Amino acid sequence: MASTTTWGGTDRGYDMSLWYDSRPLKIGWFAILFAVGAEVVFQRVFGYSHGLDSMTPEFENVWMNLWRFNVITNIINASAILGWLWTTRDRNLANLDPKTELKRYFYWMMWLACYVFGVYWAGSYTLEQDASWHQVIIRDTSFTASHIIAFYFTFPLYITMGVASYLYAMTRLPQFSKAVSFPLVGAIVGPMMILPNVGLNEWGHAFWFVDELFAAPLHWGFVTLGWCGLFGGTGGVAAQIVARMSNLCDVVWNNESKDCLHVIPY
């Protein structure tokens, strides 16, 4: 039974840091918030003053330089994160201790939380403001002040976090290293395929359906692929995590046989 400490807190009877450390999640969330916030502030300052006519030198200097910056920084960011995850992978997963595996699930859910946070900024915030931008501004290029932030910054950002989440599971969790999880693939690849769908969307707006109607067939792919991520993540992946963590808790705390860990709940 938990006891009260001299500071008015509760003594859980165990060291929380052995199981969960929220610092990586806080670092990831605040890094994403700062990066996207900086881009949004930049857009608010220079969007209408330098971002309406793509033929002007000001547009080239301000917005196309931001486009180049976004492309380069996303390549560096993806290379650094994915490279670190791969080089530090666990090469002896067959002998992974159940307690260590259980702790890794907490860290993996932090990766997934950062991925979902990135999906929000790309699929909700920047896309909604892109739709409102098209309602009042006539585009003369596909590299609009709205697209440069949405498609060339927030989209690669959440794709990197999604691939990183998949790579973490594949290289550190036995459940996902032994076989391919269809729900996890759907949760990652579905939203990822929104980016090539953007190319189809831009082509269609240029040569087929000029009006920016929200219910236009060109936009159906955004909804369908977004729902793939939602159903794959909230349904299948969540069920797999709960089932595996339940078995691990039985082994760690209830002294159950490790035989239950050989059953992979796909």
Predicted regions located by residue number:
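Perimembrane loop-to-helix junctions flanking transmembrane segments
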Residues: 47-66
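Membrane-proximal helix-loop-helix units in multi-pass membrane proteins
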Residues: 114-179
